[in-house]
Curated annotation (Swiss-Prot):
Summary of the function given for this chain in its UniProt record: Plays a role in virus cell tropism, and may be required for efficient virus replication in macrophages.
Domain of life of the native organism: Viruses
Family: Belongs to the asfivirus MGF 300 family.
Name of the molecule in the record: Protein MGF 300-2R
Amino acid sequence: MITLYEAAIKTLITHRKQILKHPDSREILLALGLYWNKTHILLKCHECGKISLTGKHSTKCININCLLILAIKKKNKRMVDTLIGMGADVTYIHFLKNKTKLSYNQLSALKSNSQISLKEFRAICYILYSRLPKKIKQGIRLCKTMAGLCGELLCAFFAP
């Protein structure tokens, strides 16, 4: 049985081209630390080895270790886990100018679990909801619960 989170992720992957047209979607997905093999949203640039949000080399390519430091400062567990998995250098965490320096063991404690917080769940729902046609949005407004809303969103995107 597929979880609601996995279904939402599958929907985001399926409709990634449409979703990535909107810059606010990229910010939310970046904050959630979401990426996938072969259908990356966070891609490593083939030319410079940095992270690219578009998959193409540009002046906006971001150093993966800078993203790791930013993720640690913001205590974004999912992003830390994602960036370490993509090959970020863990030794860069010692360059933080914070009073609390994290060791590798403390950093590994930040790694994400499979659960998703309500805030992250709402962010995914927001991405899906904002991309729907007006007719479907009117029907979804009748949903009373978050589970009902997400269910309706997923049905709307999976429908032929």
